[in-house]
Amino acid sequence: MTEQYFAKQPSAESRPVETEFTYRGHTLRLMTDSGVFSRGSVDEGSALLLESLPELKGRVLDLGCGAGVIGVCVGKVNSIELTQSDVNRRALALTEENLKRNDVSGTVIESDGFAARMKGRQL
């Protein structure tokens, strides 16, 4: 059976790969990896979601962030307080790296999405 993306510690061998994605005039350099959703490229569903988003303000939660693609994109073009969360530790490391690579501010939290585990944050 194929490992799911919600494994805390993916057993798939790490094989990081860089991809580029242009969002609203900004070319973003993103790292992806095995055991994390959409290795190697931004999937069509995420691209469609990003394309349809309005301008965002205030607090934004990217729950189940994977490599952080959606949060990094919206954080690059909006003045927001970004929190990205995932249960997958490899995904969280990629999210932190992708925030830094693209000069986007955000908080990264390991969580399965339950409010009690969001370290008291109101989102």
Say what each PLM segment does.
Residues 1-24, 35:
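N-terminal auxiliary segments of SAM/dcSAM-dependent transferases
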Residues 26-28:
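Well-ordered beta-strand scaffold positions
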Residues 32-39:
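Class I SAM-dependent methyltransferase Rossmann-like catalytic core
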Residues 41-43:
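Short, glycine/acidic-enriched capping/hinge loops at junctions between secondary-structure elements
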Residues 45-122:
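Conserved SAM/SAH cofactor-binding pocket of Class I
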